[in-house]
């Protein structure tokens, strides 16, 4: 079925960014925002070839006149028509391949609604005529990318965070925890606290500016209280940012108040545990004999784990929760923003994986529900 010479496609559809490329490559070929934009205004210049929707970078560059929508929220696809546009854009414009000629590996957050993967499967086979496909769990792929078979992965993207303990290659489903607190919530929170400084960001396009501020200037404080004191007594932590219109804004304690939400979700009114407690709780749900290995192999992955200082803070917080003599190691690979994709690239090019694909024939015989039987 799968010829050796046909490269599989690996598509990691995140809530914020879509990463796509070919299995066996060491980095994704295409990385673009998972955005579909529609014009807010009536077109007046006839013959300009205006489109009724724009995807990815093109939507981003024309954002001033568009309403931007993210079809994936909290890791779950909420708008399938837009999602189809994103996949179409991925195959035809970014990778320039015919999807009916390549097997496709897609990724998904754990504990997603079952209907979500079924619909993904259905669209791949019926709309794009894929010869074969597979849906893999994001965190498991990150562990592959770090070269381990045992560890606990804390994967945090734009829409959803989750901790997945894996022992000798087996995910432990009873101990998987999901946290609907991620990058997008931090962007929203930063929009809110910048309002206190007198800067108003309201539209979907302005939210993208705030996301950029967040990615460029925010960091995680090792000691939040101490950092707040430093910020109030001196201006050493202040940084300036130039807006697209040339106006310069100054941002101070917001730089670390924004990511602090990961450790104190109460900042945005969420009742859940912070990311350090969630990781700890996940480890505590595992068998007592394997906890030691999980503490020593805590892997961070995803774009929201890219804040400077987050690994040290995680180390400090988990050390405070764990038994005093426990060796704790937080692994934060520099390429962790793409580690899910890299893991997918590794998995899809393994010879042992080739019998795992769901083929078109199997789909035609069983329908979309086959995805639950063949994919973890």
Curated annotation (Swiss-Prot):
<dbReference type="GO" id="GO:0005524">
    <property type="term" value="F:ATP binding"/>
</dbReference>
<dbReference type="InterPro" id="IPR020902">
    <property type="entry name" value="Actin/actin-like_CS"/>
</dbReference>
<keyword id="KW-0007">Acetylation</keyword>
<dbReference type="Pfam" id="PF00022">
    <property type="entry name" value="Actin"/>
</dbReference>
<dbReference type="GO" id="GO:0016787">
    <property type="term" value="F:hydrolase activity"/>
</dbReference>
<dbReference type="GO" id="GO:0005856">
    <property type="term" value="C:cytoskeleton"/>
</dbReference>
<keyword id="KW-0206">Cytoskeleton</keyword>
<dbReference type="InterPro" id="IPR043129">
    <property type="entry name" value="ATPase_NBD"/>
</dbReference>
<feature type="propeptide" description="Removed in mature form">
    <location>
        <begin position="1"/>
        <end position="2"/>
    </location>
</feature>
<keyword id="KW-0514">Muscle protein</keyword>
<keyword id="KW-0963">Cytoplasm</keyword>
<protein>
    <recommendedName>
        <fullName>Actin, muscle</fullName>
        <ecNumber>3.6.4.-</ecNumber>
    </recommendedName>
</protein>
<dbReference type="GO" id="GO:0005737">
    <property type="term" value="C:cytoplasm"/>
</dbReference>
<dbReference type="InterPro" id="IPR004001">
    <property type="entry name" value="Actin_CS"/>
</dbReference>
<feature type="modified residue" description="N-acetylaspartate">
    <location>
        <position position="3"/>
    </location>
</feature>
<dbReference type="InterPro" id="IPR004000">
    <property type="entry name" value="Actin"/>
</dbReference>
<keyword id="KW-0547">Nucleotide-binding</keyword>
<keyword id="KW-0378">Hydrolase</keyword>
<keyword id="KW-0067">ATP-binding</keyword>
<comment type="function">
    <text>Actins are highly conserved proteins that are involved in various types of cell motility and are ubiquitously expressed in all eukaryotic cells.</text>
</comment>
<comment type="similarity">
    <text>Belongs to the actin family.</text>
</comment>
